Swiss-Prot record:
Role description: Protease with a carboxypeptidase B-like function involved in the C-terminal processing of the lysine and arginine residues from protein precursors. Promotes cell fusion and is involved in the programmed cell death.
Family: Belongs to the peptidase S10 family.
Cytoplasmic side: 538-616
Source taxonomy: Eukaryota, Fungi, Dikarya, Ascomycota, Pezizomycotina
Region Disordered, residue ranges: 468-504, 577-616
BP GO terms, sorted: apoptotic process; proteolysis
Superkingdom field: Eukaryota
Protein name: Pheromone-processing carboxypeptidase KEX1
Membrane side Lumenal: residue ranges: 29-516
């Protein structure tokens, strides 16, 4: 029996060796990509094609427990190159799960916590990354007294998030990177874009991120232009009657707003101007109940007061309960100790983010447009961030050696009619790296109303080439021109294609295995047949040699012996012949054997061995 000390030392040394080989990240408690894998999402339809998903928290400020939640969907197809679209909703403080489950994500929520497929999902040709931004929004969290106050701090934290995300998922770091979102994301996205461009200048070419485009829908980009557009839009839409007392009251408020903006130009928030929107909602209120006031996100609709659109869209009543389910919380890899229940918008984030002295993102666009294309799109029925304000923004903006959509002095880029599957969808207008798209009959959340049209817009902007994929392209035309095929239907997604390719390879491997087995069996049969044939040939050769020997012996005798034998035999086979024993006795045996040996071999013990050495 070995001494106890010797056994203990060996065991301890073995344990230390294992610890030495154990990954440092494991000892430190760092997560890997596998920890974020979404294994099973509750409510998926049975016929749903498989989509690879990852979700969870990434820490951005350890000192304040600041964590951003993300939900990543892999693309269905790769069209000529890899792309990733980061989607952000607005607020500030409103969750990007609105975008994931009501706008551009692959699923929509219905009653009974069921999911259905979105036929206009933006992950058709791009990986989709939804982030609840900034900290405290949606599933993201931070210590109560540590909400951020400004756009620069937000952008810095987002760069930290991306650094850690790409460390976990390096396969996406070299993708063409796009940012998309709506409403107050019109502030977030340009600030993040500027931070990325600044970062790229400090990195080697291999470490840079390929920022390839920005898409902002009904964006709060230029507060001055949007604040001036509330009244203009309301008069154009007939919400406020021109020349009425209500119109005069609002015009007075507009003058106060304009004065404040002239004193403090370029700010993000102007309380004096926001009061105009509130007054419009108040003046257009009718009675009580769920139809009391105008829906500020879609003026064709009405809502209860004082919500005036906050209860919209209708899918919202399903999204909240779905995301609060324990099994969904578990599936999305959420920290149960930190989860306080999903809220669409966090008023605390909003209250802390209102930094009136911040510089509006409109000031960043000219420099960004030197390097990165930007697409602004608007739903024509939105009031709060309406298309009139966006069009004023463009007209007043100077970039890339021109102002507005002027292409030559006095000539502006035309508004080109866009038709989608036979219907007039809106118009496109573009010049010098900036594109503007107006969606007819659409709300503040354009992809909610027109998922397939919005994806067609995305695909055109990203210059998607689907020629190598197959499927049925959509009929999308600008000024009657078909252009490249940008939307596809009926094609299998990457996961399905990979599974089928794997199955095909397995079948091919099985066939090759069967083929090899058949070849082996055939070789064995050939060898066996050859051996059997050789055996038969040897036996017949021996018989022929013996027969020839008897003939040779008989040829040297008198007719009295052999002639008598030959005349009497009924067959040439000696064993079958009937002959007279006395005749055979008279054959001179020794002499005939000597002659026979000189001409034939009748197979002594050494013959087979000698023959074997000469075969080639």
């Amino acid at each position: 029996m070995a001494p106890r000390f010797s056994w203990s030392f060996a065991t301890s040394w073995h344990a230390l060796a294992i610890l030495a080989l154990w990954p440092v990240s494991t000892l430190a408690g760092d997560k890997s990509a596998a920890d974020y894998y979404v294994r099973e999402l509750p409510g998926l339809p049975k016929d749903s094609p498989p989509i690879k998903m990852h979700a969870g928290h990434i820490e951005v400020t350890p000192e304040t427990n600041g964590n951003l939640f993300f939900w990543h969907f892999q693309n269905n197809h790769i069209a000529n190159r890899q792309r990733t679209v980061v989607w952000l909703n607005g607020g500030p403080g409103c969750s990007s799960e609105d975008g994931a489950l009501m706008e551009v994500g692959p699923y929509r929520v219905t009653k009974d916590n069921a999911l259905t497929l979105n036929n206009g999902t933006w992950n058709e040709f791009a990986n989709l990354l939804f982030v609840d931004n900034p900290v405290g929004t949606g599933f993201s969290y931070v210590d109560t007294n540590s909400y951020i106050h400004g756009l620069n701090a937000m952008a810095t934290q987002f760069i930290t998030f991306l650094e850690k995300f790409f460390a976990l998922f390096p396969e996406y770091e070299s993708d063409d990177l796009y940012f998309a979102g709506e409403s107050y994301a019109g502030q977030h996205i340009p600030y993040i874009a500027k931070a990325i461009l600044d970062r790229n200048k400090l990195k080697s070419r291999a470490e840079t991120w390929k920022l390839s485009g920005l898409l902002i829908g009904n964006g709060w980009i230029s507060p001055q232009d949007q604040s001036s557009a509330y009244l203009k839009f309301s008069l154009e839409k007939g919400l406020i009657e021109k020349g009425s007392d209500n119109a005069q009251q609002l015009q007075h408020m507009q003058r106060i707003c304009d004065k404040e903006m002239s004193i403090n130009p370029g700010h993000v928030d102007y309380p004096e101007c926001e009061s105009i929107l509130n007054k419009i909602l108040e003046l257009t209120r009718e009675g009580s109940g769920d139809q009391a006031c105008i829906n500020m996100y879609d003026v064709r609709l009405r809502d209860s007061a004082p919500s005036c659109g906050m209860n919209w869209p209708p899918d919202l009543k399903y999204v909240g309960p779905y995301l609060r389910q324990p099994q969904v919380i578990s599936a999305l890899n959420l920290d149960k100790q930190r989860n306080t229940g999903w809220q669409e918008c966090n008023s605390m984030v909003n209250a802390n983010f209102r930094n009136q002295n911040a510089t509006a993102s409109i000031s960043l666009l000219p420099d960004i447009l030197k390097e990165v294309p930007i697409l602004l799109f608007s739903g024509a029925e939105d009031l709060i961030c309406n298309h009139v304000g966006t069009e004023e923004l463009i007209s007043n903006l100077a970039w890339n050696e021109g102002k507005g959509f002027e292409v030559t002095p006095g000539n502006w880029a035309p508004r080109r009619q866009w038709t989608f599957e036979g219907e007039v969808a809106g118009f496109w207008q573009e010049a010098r790296n900036l594109t503007y798209v107006l969606f007819h009959n659409a709300s503040h959340m354009v992809p909610f109303d027109y998922p397939r049209r919005s994806r067609d817009m995305l695909d055109r902007f990203m210059k998607v080439d689907i020629s190598s994929i197959g499927g049925q392209p959509s009929d999308s035309r600008i000024d009657g021109e078909k252009g490249p095929d940008t939307s596809v239907g009926g094609a299998k997604n990457n996961t399905q294609q990979h599974e089928e390719e794997t199955k095909q390879k397995l079948n091919e491997a099985k066939w090759h295995a069967y083929q090899r087995s058949g070849e082996v069996v055939l070789v064995i049969v050939i060898i066996a047949a050859s051996v059997w044939g050789y055996f038969v040939w040897r036996q017949r050769r021996k018989g022929a040699a013996y027969s020839a020997l008897q003939n040779d012996e008989a040829a040297g005798q008198s007719r009295t012996g052999l002639a008598a034998f030959h005349d009497r035999q009924s067959d040439r086979d000696l064993e079958a012949a009937a002959f007279d024993e006395t005749t055979v006795d008279n054959i001179p045996l020794q002499e005939s054997i000597g002659r026979g040996e000189s001409k034939y071999s009748i197979g002594d013990d050494s013959d087979e061995e000698e023959e074997g050495t000469t075969k080639t």
